[in-house]
Amino acid sequence: TCPSLYDLRNLFQVNVEEGRHLWAMVYLLHAHFGRDGREEGEALLARRSGDADNPRILTAFNEKTPDWLSFFMFTFITDRDGKYQLAALAESGFDPLSRTCRFMLTEEAHHMFVGESGIARIIQRTCDAMKEHKTEDAARLRGLGVIDLPTLQKYLNFHYSVTSDLYGSEISSNAASFYANGLKGRFEETKLADDHRLHGSEYPYMEVTGDQIVVNHAPALTALNERLRDDWVTDVQAGVSRWNRIPEKAGIAFRFT
């Protein structure tokens, strides 16, 4: 069952639009890349999320979505990855790809709204129940028909982790090649105040050395994946901060991190 007809309509709209995004990419492959493009397009259409024999390439898109909380987290966090990947491709010098991605970005904005507002409603209802019944006990809150805040945090942790992997290796020669050849840009490339060639520039990234996380620097061209991930992290944090206003306003100490 769905929380409301409004949510059911949003679910249908998100699914229809994501299907349209798939077909848009298949069209580009068929229209501009000859026989190889047609074969890749057919392979895209053949893949199924979670299928044992022909799954999606990226792990995050094979994870199950068994409940509405998972759906809202997916649209808030994982569709936000889509925003940044599409924005980078919208900077492409290949005009058909650029125009297609710009159109898709308008639909991704709605998907993220569905996720953020859906989770916000859940948090609000939980905080209302906590205040009304003066309890933070998870079992009692679940008995009242709401989702306790620590469980929401666990869902947030999971979806954040699997989505973070979508950006690939922090240091990538492929990312450098795509950028140097004009296939892909950075998020809001035209707003960045540099030479847009990145020769001699560096970018910080974190890695594990021994038992510590240390900050290193790499050529900016090879660290483009990490830069895009950092942009995404900042945006996710902004949404989480908006969620945190709800328990803060209710006088509840819990904060999402």
Model-derived segments and their meaning:
Residues S92-L156:
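Glycine- and acidic-residue-rich phosphate-binding/metal-coordinating active-site segment common to enzymes
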Residues T1, R56-P66, M73, A87-A88, ...:
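Domain-scale activation on soluble regions of proteins
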Residues T1-Q13, D81-S98:
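Helix-loop segments that flank and shape redox-cofactor active sites
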Residues C2, D7, A31-E40, I122-K131:
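Short, glycine/acidic-rich hinge or "gate" loops at secondary-structure transitions
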Residues F33-S70, F74, K134-A139, K154-F158, ...:
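Carboxylate-rich helix-loop segments that flank metal/cofactor sites and access channels
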Residues N15-L45, G115-A120:
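Conserved alpha-helical segments that form or flank metal/cofactor-binding pockets of metalloenzymes
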Residues K131-T257:
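Extended, helix-rich structural scaffolds rather than catalytic motifs
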Residues H21, T78-Q85, H111:
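Amphipathic, well-ordered alpha-helical segments in soluble domains
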